[in-house]
């Protein structure tokens, strides 16, 4: 009886180890991509509302246009400033990418060099969203899976400002890949 229990436990350990490595194999790791944290700080809960009425700016009906911004958090948040770099695409090598991932909070992103292409995990047509130097975009976070690739022949870079719940991982690898894109 004791020997049978030992074999059952050994089999369970081997199975758990195999599953651990199989799950890692399904992950979509970054390739040709580096991320450097430039700054990190923690802030308590806050609510900020701003508005601005630009002078001499009206809509089609002659009404003044108003700019609005609202940010509200509950609980402490970590604020990151990240510098991200993608290597240039080289013939015969994989395209530099972040791998499929998500973030627990949103990111404000400015492309500072080259061109980046963002693909959304919930887009059945795998539509490329292309951003070149000087352009900005928002990643909504909250489990929103995406991959950012440098499909160009020059190095691409961006700066990302991320607001996430305090103490949580900044990046969450998505495994397996969503399956909506051919890569």
Model-derived features: positions:
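Short acidic-glycine-tyrosine-enriched beta hairpin
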Residues: 121-143
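Short histidine-centered beta-strand/loop micro-motifs
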Residues: 96-103, 120, 129, 149-150
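A short beta-loop-beta micro-motif enriched in histidine and acidic residues
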Residues: 74-77, 86-110
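A short, N-terminal "cap"/entry segment at the start of jelly-roll beta-barrel domains
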Residues: 4-7, 18-82, 129-130, 175-183
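Ligand-binding loop in jelly-roll beta-barrel domains
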Residues: 132, 141-169
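Glycine- and acidic-residue-biased ligand/ion/polar-headgroup-sensing regions
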Residues: 103-123, 135
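N-terminal post-signal-peptidase region of extra-cytosolic proteins
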Residues: 84-88, 93-96, 120, 124, ...
């Amino acid at each position: 009886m004791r020997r049978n229990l030992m074999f059952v436990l050994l089999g369970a350990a081997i199975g758990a180890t195999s599953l651990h490595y199989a799950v890692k194999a399904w992950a979509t790791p970054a390739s040709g991509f580096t991320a450097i944290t430039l700054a990190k700080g923690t802030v308590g809960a806050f609510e900020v509302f701003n508005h601005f009425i630009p002078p001499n700016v009206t809509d089609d009906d002659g009404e003044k246009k108003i700019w609005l911004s609202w940010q509200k958090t509950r609980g402490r948040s970590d604020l990151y400033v990240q510098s991200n770099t993608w290597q240039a695409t080289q013939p015969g090598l994989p395209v530099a990418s972040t791998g499929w991932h998500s973030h627990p909070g949103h990111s404000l992103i400015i492309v500072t060099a080259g061109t980046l292409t963002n693909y959304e995990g919930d887009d059945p047509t795998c539509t490329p969203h292309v951003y070149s130097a000087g352009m900005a975009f928002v990643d909504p976070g909250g489990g929103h899976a995406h991959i950012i690739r440098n499909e160009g022949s020059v190095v691409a870079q961006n700066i990302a400002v991320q607001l996430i719940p305090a103490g949580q991982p900044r990046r969450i690898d998505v495994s397996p890949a969503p399956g909506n894109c051919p890569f």
